[in-house]
Amino acid sequence: FAKDLKIPQNFEVVLDVDLLLQEAVERVIGKAGEDPEFTKVLLDFALEKIEDDRSWDIGFDLLKIGKLIFDENNAAHLKSLNAIELGDFLKLQNHLKKQTKDIEKKVEELATACLELITNAGLDFKDFPRETLPNHFKKIIAGNYSPTQLYNNKLENNLIEGKILKATVKNAPIDLAPQLLVYYQTIKQLIYKRGLFANINRNIVPFALLNAIQKELKIIQEEKDQLSISEFN
């Protein structure tokens, strides 16, 4: 039976997976200060917790993350992480950070171009109802990239319909609204792309640590000729 499963003849089935997980988490945390990559990932994780107003004690959250390993619904998916090294996660993180900064620079340039387009057309920002449209671009230039705050309004519809100026404003360029619409929609696509990258980036560190815990669990079980009850089943 053991031979068929390619496990030690005298293997021990571990019923208390919490103890096994605790040891794996302690080993992962213990690498802080020894391994530069682990140190960076653990520090990033702790800083994320502080930013979310959670306790800086990462042990509790690592245990919570680690329990996903013993859920049979996750087993097949998590095994696919085994071939990924910690450095690969960090490379992806750095790549996404660069892409995010590039997007931020691009949308700032486009939003600035929108304001210039308005002023070059001989218009004042006060010519727009409540200055909503100019303020929209000003928010982006100021670093507001929240889709909820930027796009929970009728600005796009107004641009499509050409209803962007006060009724008292006459002789505005006919092509102003269509031009601004192109800028608006281009920026919108980039803002949502940035949001996607940010969400992926937020999950890279937890995934990297989950992978590290999974590898430590395997090492521990091989050292002690053990098999967790979830794997045995």
Predicted regions and their residues:
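Coupling/switch/interface segments within P-loop NTPase motor domains and analogous charged loops
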Residues: 34-48, 127-215
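Accessory N-terminal region flanking or inserted into the helicase ATPase core
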Residues: 3-10, 21, 75-98, 175-233
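Conserved ATP-dependent motor core of P-loop NTPases, especially the RecA-like helicase ATPase domain
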Residues: 1-143, 223
